[in-house]
Amino acid sequence: MLEYPIAPGKVEAFTTFRDSELPYFVVTGHQVHGTRIALVTDPATDRDSLEGYDALMTNVKGCAIGVRTADCIPVLLYDPVKEAVAAIHSGWKGTLNRISPKTIFRMKDVFGTDPEDLKAVIGPGICRNCFQVGDEVVQYFKGNGINIEPIYSWNGPRQEGSMKGGHHLDLIEENRLLLMECGVPAANIQVSGLCTYEDGRFFSARREGASCGRNINAIKML
């Protein structure tokens, strides 16, 4: 299990490996690559009651919340001032539609969060070198007002069965930039730097197929 020192003694945050066992129950939703955000108030909330939510937040101590990923980008947030946390599932659609900023704005509305106080973790996800996309995805990003220059690369003609050529996007970096645009200090953002496609310790839908297992990315206030 990959643990993050986001606030030792106050918060536990981690990403599971494929052979990890959860240390306790983690509330997760049925994710649909959307931007709906759920406020969780019961540590025993079952997954079926969270249909269609790709981000969860809570201010309940002892309530572990999380998101399931297998190449998509997990973002975990902690507000040490208002004492609240959030877990975000940000695939290319969620990144395109700014689910991370929307979650921060929701935390501001519900908890009074100041983005400058937030501590963030961007967990393992597919890296730019491995995230090959079609031209239509690039156009979606351009059309949605996102400056793709810092996150885009053209790696030459696309070859059948290879991830090396074609268009590539850096969802990890885009989520970091989106957090900073919201006011989260760069120094407060931890990036794991691990690629789920390259690192066999993690499940990867692109490497193994969509029916593979999922990595659990969780956060809990103590």
How would you label these PLM feature ranges?
Residues 1-222:
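Active-site microenvironment for binding and transforming phosphate-containing groups
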